[in-house]
Amino acid sequence: YNKSRQEVLVMRVKAIMMPFSKLACISVENTVEEAMKIIDEQGLLSLPVVDGQQFVGVLSKQFLFEEFFRNYTGTREEFAQRKVMEFMKTRIETIGENTRIEEAAAMFITSKVRFIPITNEQNKLLGIVTQQAVFKEYQKIFGNKHNSMAIYTYDIRGVLGRFMGPL
C-alpha cells in the first residue's frame, strides 16, 4: 500500500478549507455596491453571505449582472443601494468540516459552484473549500509519481469538463 494514497482516503475538508477568519464575506444588510466592491477588489466571482456568523446564502457577480441587465428597470444608483439579501441564493448545499475530500470533489462534479460552504450543526460558517484546494491536495498526493489518475463519474456529456473546470 502506498502510504500517500492511503492518506487521501481519510483526508477531511477541514485540512484544506479557507477558515472563516480569512474569508471575504458579506452581510445580509450590506448593499449591492458594498458587495461588488469586495468582489472586484479581491477578484472573486461570488461571496458567502452571513448574518453574524450564520451562513445564509451566496451572492454571485453573475446573478447580480443578470438581474440588473435583464430584469431591473430602475437606475444603477438605486440598484447599488439595494440589500444583498434581495439577491442572494439561499438553497446552497453545505458540508461539515469532517466531510471527506473526495465527497467534496464529487459535489463539484454535480454542481456549478466554485466553493462549498463548511458549517457546523448550528449553521455557523466555519470556512469554505474551493475546487482549487481540492485539486491542489490531489496533486500533492499523486504528484508526478504516477502516470495517470482515474476519475469515476456518470456517463453524461460535459461532466468531466465541469469536474476539471477552470482552476
Each PLM stretch: what is its role?
Residues 1-2:
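Intrinsic-disorder-associated, low-complexity terminal segments enriched in Asp/Asn/His/Tyr and depleted
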Residues 39-42, 47-63, 108, 116-132:
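A glycine-centered beta-loop-beta connector
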Residues 32-37, 105:
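Short, basic/aromatic recognition patches
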